[in-house]
């Protein structure tokens, strides 16, 4: 037996029948009572639709569901309370209300005892709303005050339509008041003010805050009252005070108040007509917000987990046998089963990534080869669950037993040792999704041959797993790279092993060297000598990768099929190259509006950030890159070729178009990369690919992890395809920010490290032999720009570039820490030769060119919302970091800031005797002739940067060794800059066969001499025309040996120049003054650095001292009658007479004292 007791108030009964029915159904929906009985009760409410008494100040609805036994006491108490309230109301209402002044005073005295707040009646709601929570006015007081006013004014006020203003009571219905009306209103106003003043003093300070909060909550409830919600956890007092504030806001903001309401009190009347805003959600209690709103994803977030998980039906019984994975899998089913199968489910459901490992086979043969590598990668890291943040079980890579015959497998194993040995295996690689990495390797095949080492793991991982796309996320079939059988002779493996030695041998085993300054790692193998040794094996591989691909950039950029670099047919004896060749065919896949190619033997590619809302750009990373890290890529394609030990931390921000990422074979680790709405393909023999989280509310994406990938987790990839080829030791931290236009990035061969670089809307090209290119951040909302880094750059890190083209020529060990401050006019920055350090400088919209032989150029940040600019750093700069010390440039900061054209210091013609200068002179002529010296051409037209090499000299000496690779790179590709910037196919520089006599070492060392020696000290050559930077070296003189060529430049750059970044960072004029004051010291430094005293003074004389060459440089730089600009700069660097000229050029205004001040500072 169920009893239903309902106490109705006038405020509640003031609603219409439909609203009452809705409200009662909400309150009684949890009660199990007959529907017909409830309907009868609701239908009878219309009879009570009248304005009655206040029931003793208790205006709210009591709905009591009482059961026969345990609730009799409660029912009795409520009945007693109801009758007492009714009797009190009846007696008080019959206590003579004659409207006299004594009755009014008695009413206010009663208010002193019982009333702690005021009530107001809004014009649009016709309801009384308490000013603050818990304070009530007695019925006697209300009726006394109301009747007193109504008896005086009822005849004159029609239907309570009062248009009086709150602060001015001078009009009623648009008419002037009479003396009698004015007197009546003054009496009523005086009564209101007396009550207000009294209650202001009555309310203690501690209660005033609660009063204000209640007024705000009441106003918010009044605005959001679309229906009385069901509040199961609210107390009676709370529900009572929140009833009845539900009508929609009125069109007018006027409010009529009782005589008991003051003029300053009605905050509710002010807030009521306001439209519902986000502030209401913030200020309103969570119960009022969430209940009336429809169930959405926000309700799931804000509702406690018990409410979400309890009503959901349990998941279906797991198909697989109960295991450790089932524990995680069941929870995912409980959460995702009631939800619709959307793209968000794929993002948030780790069940798909949980690759349950297959049981290993009995004979432990070739798997031992992979096992050893896994141990090297995973051994130093602790097996704690924290390392494998979310699913460590999957990351537990149980190593396979090594294969018996150490043949071609050793070729892969050795590079892993070189790459992973010196670097510590950090737990960050397995950070967020260890479950996917827990790919327990399958048992090796019976015959432990060299082929089994590569093939058998693939069979173990792919054999037991179904070939469906769901297993490999969405398109596994494409990434299933079935390796070809290796050749019988294990000599080709030594060929791969030797490059690893070249890269790792001279460089320290420190992980930091690989991350930020891998230039030392950059030991790219030289072409082999006449007898075919291990170098020939590398050369053949390059032919396989570069030969079969078309030279069209569009094919590699937008057509993934073209990226599938189908290897050339192997030579007659099937060596280990055949094994690599097959994966190259499998590497080509789809990529969104951009593409990144990283070629073979790249130990690390990590941390490549790209900021959003930028124009398209390209990035290509070619062979022999030890490390590429810290780069973020938005909508671009990234291809990483063979021999990359690790690819990790590739985050991509959400809400981007689909993209693809392909990682080819023999990648020991690919971790920390987040991939959003794109397919990701990781090929065989990847020990770890981890931390690939997916953000919610994004479009569907695909992720494919091919065979033998222990783990792929924590990588974010937005709308771009990424391909990583074989034997890449590390490719990590490649975040991509959302809402950006397509872009491309190309990094050419032999780059030991490219890390931490952010690229905005520009194409970036990094050529061969760059040990490190890292930390190149680009801020968003900038115009398109281009960045080209030429050969032999040991390190390029930490540089932010805005909307400008950046060209870094050969043999630059490091370019770092060149910050640029925002909100500045366009300017240019030129760093000339022999600058020990230029770092920490802020540059806004200027062109900056970095030429050859710069040991370090790093941390070049550019602030957003700036016009396009260029950055040029000239040749032979040992270090450019953290300082503004400009030796060859004038000490005036204004010249570099606002007048970039003057900085284009076109080099003067060399002296009469054709010495090493002639070697520089010829490339400069070739570069200057076909390309215009306009900086705009470099910014928007990359074709100028495609410097087609000049024909070699007659005698094929060591120069031919350098010249031949240039022919291979430039010959098959068109000389247009667009091909290099946006067409990775052109970057596929297929090397020409080396000359017979010079040894492999001479091939690398001799170019260093040619690049170091023959380059002019003028920064103008590399300023605005990147084509000029493509300085194809002339054949060196006979006596100079190849070893001295490499060693001498390193000594000249590092020895005589101080590595202080502060000197070049903020005080370039000081550097200029010191250079001018210490003119004898500078030539001494050059002699110590170059080990050759005659060429150094010649360079300085040609660049700074000789006036005859300076006018010549002016003519070559501008190609226009703008000779005074180069004169100003050159004179600012060397001659005091030209310094005032520089001031004029910098400011374009007569502001010569400004550069003087800067020089003094």
Swiss-Prot record:
Intrachain disulfide bonds: none
Top-rank taxon, per record: Eukaryota
Q: Which UniProt keywords apply?
A: Membrane, Transmembrane, Transmembrane helix
Q: What is its main location?
A: membrane
Which GO terms of the cellular component aspect does the record hold? membrane
Give me the stretches of Basic and acidic residues compositional bias. 368-378, 410-420, 452-462, 494-504, 536-546, 918-928, 960-970, 1002-1012, 1044-1054
The residue stretches assigned to a coiled coil in this entry are none
- Regions of biased composition (Pro residues) lie at 311-321
Q: What is this protein called?
A: Nuclear pore complex-interacting protein family member B11
Q: Which organism is it from?
A: Homo sapiens (Human)
């Amino acid at each position: 037996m169920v009893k239903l007791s309902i106490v109705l108030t006038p405020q509640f009964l003031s609603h219409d029948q439909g609203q009452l029915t809705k409200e009662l159904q909400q309150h009684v929906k949890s009660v199990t009572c007959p529907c017909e009985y409830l309907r009868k009760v609701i239908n009878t409410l219309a009879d009570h639709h009248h304005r009655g008494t206040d029931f003793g100040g208790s205006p709210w609805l009591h709905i009591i569901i009482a059961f026969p036994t345990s609730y009799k006491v409660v029912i009795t108490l409520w009945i007693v309370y109801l009758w007492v309230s009714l009797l009190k109301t009846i007696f008080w209402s019959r206590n003579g209300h004659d409207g006299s002044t004594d009755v009014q005073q008695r009413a206010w005295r009663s208010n002193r005892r019982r009333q702690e707040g005021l009530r107001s009646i809004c014009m649009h709601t016709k309801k009384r709303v308490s000013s603050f929570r818990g304070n009530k006015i007695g019925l006697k007081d209300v009726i006394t005050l109301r009747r007193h006013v109504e008896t005086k004014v009822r005849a004159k006020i029609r239907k309570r339509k009062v248009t009086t203003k709150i602060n001015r009571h001078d009009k009623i219905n648009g008419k002037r008041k009479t003396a009698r009306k004015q007197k009546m209103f003054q009496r009523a106003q005086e009564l209101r003010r007396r009550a207000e003043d009294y209650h202001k003093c009555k309310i203690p300070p501690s209660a005033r805050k609660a009063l204000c909060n209640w007024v705000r909550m009441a106003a918010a409830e009044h605005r959001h009252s679309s229906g009385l919600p069901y509040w199961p956890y609210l107390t009676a007092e709370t529900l009572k005070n929140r009833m009845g504030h539900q009508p929609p806001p009125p069109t007018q903001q006027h409010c009529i108040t009782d005589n008991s309401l003051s003029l300053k009190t009605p905050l509710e009347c002010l807030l009521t007509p306001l439209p519902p805003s986000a502030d209401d959600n913030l200020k309103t209690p969570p119960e009022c917000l969430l209940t009336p709103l429809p169930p959405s994803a926000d309700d799931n977030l804000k509702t406690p987990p018990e409410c979400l998980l309890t009503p959901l039906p349990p998941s279906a019984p797991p198909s697989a046998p109960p295991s450790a994975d089932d524990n995680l899998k069941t929870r995912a089913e409980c959460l995702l089963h009631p939800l619709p199968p959307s793209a968000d489910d794929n993002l948030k459901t780790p069940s798909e990534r949980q690759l349950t490992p297959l049981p290993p086979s009995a004979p432990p043969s070739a798997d031992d080869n992979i096992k050893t590598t896994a141990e090297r990668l995973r051994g130093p890291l602790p097996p704690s669950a924290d390392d494998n943040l979310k699913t460590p079980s999957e990351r537990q890579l149980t190593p396979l037993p090594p294969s018996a015959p150490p043949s071609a497998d050793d070729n892969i194993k050795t590079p892993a040792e070189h790459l992973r040995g010196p670097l510590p295996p950090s737990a960050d690689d397995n950070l967020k999704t260890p479950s996917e990495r827990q790919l327990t390797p399958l048992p090796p095949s019976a015959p432990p041959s060299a082929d089994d080492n590569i093939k058998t793991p693939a069979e173990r991982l792919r054999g037991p797993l179904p070939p469906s796309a769901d297993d490999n996320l969405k398109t596994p079939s494409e990434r299933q790279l079935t390796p070809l059988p290796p050749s019988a002779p294990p000599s080709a493996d030594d060929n791969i092993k030797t490059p690893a030695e070249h890269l790792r041998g001279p460089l320290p085993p420190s992980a930091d060297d690989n991350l930020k300054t891998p230039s030392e790692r950059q030991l790219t193998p030289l072409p082999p000598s006449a007898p075919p040794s291990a170098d020939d094996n590398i050369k053949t591989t390059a032919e396989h990768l570069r030969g079969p691909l078309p030279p069209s950039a569009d094919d590699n950029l937008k057509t993934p099929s073209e990226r599938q670099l189908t290897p050339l047919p192997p030579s007659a004896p099937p060596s280990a190259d055949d094994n690599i060749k097959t994966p190259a065919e499998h590497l080509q896949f789809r990529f969104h509006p951009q593409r990144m190619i990283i070629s073979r033997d790249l130990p690390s590619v990590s941390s490549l950030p790209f900021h959003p809302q930028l124009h398209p750009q390209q990035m290509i990373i070619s062979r022999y890159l030890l490390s590429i890290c810290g780069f973020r890529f938005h909508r671009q394609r990234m291809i990483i070729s063979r021999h990359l030990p690790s690819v990790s931390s590739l985050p991509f921000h959400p809400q981007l178009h689909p993209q693809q990422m392909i990682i080819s074979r023999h990648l020991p680790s690919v971790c920390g990369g987040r991939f959003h709405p794109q397919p990701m393909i990781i090929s065989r023999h990847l020990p770890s690919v981890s931390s690939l989280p997916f953000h919610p509310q994004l479009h569907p994406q695909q992720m494919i992890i091919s065979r033998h990938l222990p783990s792929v987790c924590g990588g974010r990839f937005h709308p771009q395809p990424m391909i990583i080829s074989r034997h890449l030791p590390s490719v990590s931290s490649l975040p991509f920010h959302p809402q950006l236009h397509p872009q491309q990035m190309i990094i050419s061969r032999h780059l030991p490290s490219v890390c931490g670089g952010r690229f905005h809307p520009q194409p970036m090209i990094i050529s061969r032999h760059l040990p490190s290119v890292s930390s190149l951040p680009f801020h968003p909302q900038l115009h398109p720009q281009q960045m080209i880094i030429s050969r032999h750059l040991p390190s390029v890190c930490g540089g932010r570039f805005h909307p400008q083209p950046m060209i870094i020529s050969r043999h630059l060990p490091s370019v770092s820490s060149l910050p640029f401050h925002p909100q500045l006019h366009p300017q240019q920055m030129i760093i000339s030769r022999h600058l020990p350090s230029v770092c920490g400088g802020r540059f806004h919209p200027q062109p900056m060119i970095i030429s050859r032989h710069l040991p370090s150029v790093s941390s070049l940040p550019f602030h957003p919302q700036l016009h396009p600019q260029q950055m040029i750093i000239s040749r032979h700069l040992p270090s450019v970091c953290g300082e503004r010390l400009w030796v060859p440039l004038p000490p005036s900061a204004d010249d570099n800031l606002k007048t970039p054209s003057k900085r284009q210091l076109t080099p003067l013609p060399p002296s009469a005797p054709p010495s090493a200068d002639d070697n520089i002179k010829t490339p400069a002529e070739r570069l200057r002739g076909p390309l215009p010296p306009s900086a705009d051409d470099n910014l928007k037209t990359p074709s100028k940067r495609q410097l087609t090499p000049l024909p070699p000299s007659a005698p094929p000496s060591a120069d031919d060794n350098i010249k031949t690779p240039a022919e291979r790179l430039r010959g098959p590709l068109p000389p247009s800059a667009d091909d290099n910037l946006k067409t990775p196919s052109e970057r596929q520089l297929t090397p020409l066969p080396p000359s017979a006599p010079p040894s492999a070492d001479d091939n690398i060392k001799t170019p260093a001499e040619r690049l170091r020696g023959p380059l002019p000290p003028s920064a103008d050559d590399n300023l605005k025309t990147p084509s000029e930077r493509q300085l194809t070296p002339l054949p060196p003189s006979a006596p100079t040996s190849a070893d001295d060529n490499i060693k001498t430049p390193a000594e000249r750059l590092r020895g005589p120049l101080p590595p202080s970044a502060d000197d070049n960072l903020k005080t370039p004029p000081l550097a200029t003054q010191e250079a001018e004051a210490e003119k004898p010291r500078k030539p001494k430094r050059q002699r110590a650095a170059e080990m050759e005293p005659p060429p150094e003074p010649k360079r300085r004389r040609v660049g700074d001292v000789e006036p005859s060459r300076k006018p010549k440089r002016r003519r070559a730089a501008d190609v226009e009658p703008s000779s005074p600009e180069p004169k100003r700069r050159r004179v600012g660097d060397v001659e005091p007479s030209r310094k005032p000229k520089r001031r004029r050029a910098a400011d374009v205004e007569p502001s010569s004292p400004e550069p003087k001040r800067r020089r003094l500072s």
